[in-house]
């Protein structure tokens, strides 16, 4: 049968169908961005003579960049960074719970969340009768919520200037210091403007130039939540930030300064299973303060009662009295953790309560984290680093992120306080073997 030419209408319909199919494969529409506002400058004095002799560390976080994204998605700049230095091909272990604020702060203090004060993104403190929420600027900028000595405060206390283009805790005065240079969090600041600011800091006179710098990108966490870890949008976001790392690395190389570039993530991502698991369907939580899945009983009798109601309630979680939480979680020594504690057995979104009557009950996001990385390997984070102080072509087995703190402090020539981490874990990646006398 002879083929007949397509009509204009048919061609138009085919064009529309093709356009829609292509659009379905594209990442979500990027949000509007704007230039960076003026940097906040704290007068911590000039770099000491000793600090001016030290090398530089630029610590970058790619939020939610799961340990296997680089190889799965072909993140060529990150993989090249790993080949030029060191990386963790099987991932880095976040601290429990594998949320953003607890783990960013664990990285820069070397303290598990039970010791660093940030036991979750949002939690309640019974002694203060107050709540910490990452969306509350008055809490985020209040240094009394935070424990430990973050790397920027450690540097400032030893005469070395620091700068933070975002990092949880960097807007607060902690251990007596704020970074010499920092910005208030605003995720709409243009991605390239962030890199330009980092490079501008490195062009300052030696007396004012920060030797420790942080940089943060919220991607691909957002896409992982909205679309899931296997989505095309998540892949596109991962490759986008990989491109930014390539641009940053080229800019750092052009400074000809001795800079160690360290790229990490805070946690991974997994596909959310089923719908919500709502605890008040299994237990009477009357009289409890609750924040997400965290439960704060006002009396021992209430805590024991709710524990007994929950301990055999569902296969989707395990209930513990706080004192009985397995030691490997490092999550039993801070009252902010609540009591009893609920630990998910899989990728289940757990909450204490649903919305009030009459309000829509939205399903959980497509992707989630916060789970135990020892039970859920999808929670593992990423680690790449290269620079003049780091051995090239080295790979490391999975390690806990608290071990980064003494390692970065060593790169900067700083004396670090005792923490939950150890320089010994990553000493084999250092050209001087972690020997203080060699610095």
Regions found by a protein language model. Name each.
Residues 2-14:
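Bacterial N-terminal signal peptides that target proteins for export
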Residues 12-24:
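Bacterial N-terminal signal peptides
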Residues 33-54, 67-157, 173-174:
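Active-site nucleophile/metal-coordination loop of metallo-enzymes that catalyze phosphate/sulfate
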Residues 39, 52, 191-203, 213, ...:
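A long, amphipathic alpha-helix that forms part
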Residues 53-57, 84-88, 157-163, 207-213, ...:
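Loop/turn elements at helix/coil->beta-strand transitions in domains of secreted/extracellular proteins
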Residues 59, 77, 240-279:
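Metal-dependent active-site segment of extracytoplasmic phospho-/sulfohydrolases and closely related
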Residues 111-228, 315:
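His/Asp/Glu-rich, glycine-adjacent segments
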Residues 288-395, 399-410:
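Active-site neighborhoods of enzymes that stabilize oxyanions during catalysis
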């Amino acid at each position: 049968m002879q083929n007949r030419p397509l009509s204009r209408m048919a061609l138009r319909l085919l064009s529309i169908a093709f356009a829609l199919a292509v659009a379905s494969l594209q990442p979500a529409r990027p949000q509007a961005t704007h230039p960076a506002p003026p940097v906040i400058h704290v007068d911590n004095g000039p770099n000491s003579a000793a600090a001016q002799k030290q090398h530089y560390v630029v610590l970058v976080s790619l939020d939610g960049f799961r340990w296997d994204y680089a190889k799965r998605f072909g993140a060529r700049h990150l993989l090249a960074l790993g080949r030029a230095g060191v990386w963790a091909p099987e991932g880095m272990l976040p601290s429990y719970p594998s949320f953003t604020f607890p783990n960013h702060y664990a990285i820069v203090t070397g303290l598990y969340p039970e010791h660093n004060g940030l036991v979750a993104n949002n939690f309640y403190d019974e002694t203060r009768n107050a709540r910490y929420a990452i969306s509350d600027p008055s809490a985020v900028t209040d240094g009394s919520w935070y424990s430990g000595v973050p790397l920027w405060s450690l540097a400032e206390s030893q005469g070395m200037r620091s700068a933070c283009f975002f990092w949880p805790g960097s807007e607060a005065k902690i251990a007596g210091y704020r970074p010499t240079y920092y910005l208030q969090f605003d995720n709409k600041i243009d991605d390239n403007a962030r890199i330009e600011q980092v490079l501008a800091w490195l062009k300052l006179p030696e007396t004012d130039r920060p030797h420790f710098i942080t940089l943060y990108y919220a991607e691909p966490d957002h896409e992982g939540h909205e679309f899931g870890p296997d989505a095309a949008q998540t892949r596109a976001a991962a490759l986008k930030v990989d491109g930014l790392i390539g641009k940053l690395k080229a800019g750092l190389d052009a400074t000809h300064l001795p800079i160690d570039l360290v790229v990490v993530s805070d946690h991974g991502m997994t596909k959310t299973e089923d719908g919500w698991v709502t605890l008040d369907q299994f237990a009477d939580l009357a009289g409890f303060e609750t924040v997400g899945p965290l439960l704060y009983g006002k009396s021992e009798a209430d805590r024991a009662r709710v524990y007994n109601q929950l301990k055999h309630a569902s296969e989707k979680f395990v209930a513990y009295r706080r004192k009985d939480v397995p030691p490997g979680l490092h999550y039993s020594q801070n009252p902010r953790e609540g009591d009893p504690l609920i630990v998910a057995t899989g990728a289940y979104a757990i909450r204490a309560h649903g919305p009030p009557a009459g309000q829509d009950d939205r399903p959980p996001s497509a992707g989630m984290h916060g789970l135990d990385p020892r039970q859920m390997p999808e929670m593992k984070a990423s680690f790449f680093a290269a620079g003049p102080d780091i051995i090239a072509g080295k790979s490391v087995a999975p390690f806990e992120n608290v071990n980064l703190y003494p390692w970065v402090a060593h790169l900067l020539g700083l004396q670090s306080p005792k923490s939950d981490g150890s320089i010994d874990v990553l000493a084999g990646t250092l050209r001087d073997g972690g020997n203080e006398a060699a610095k």
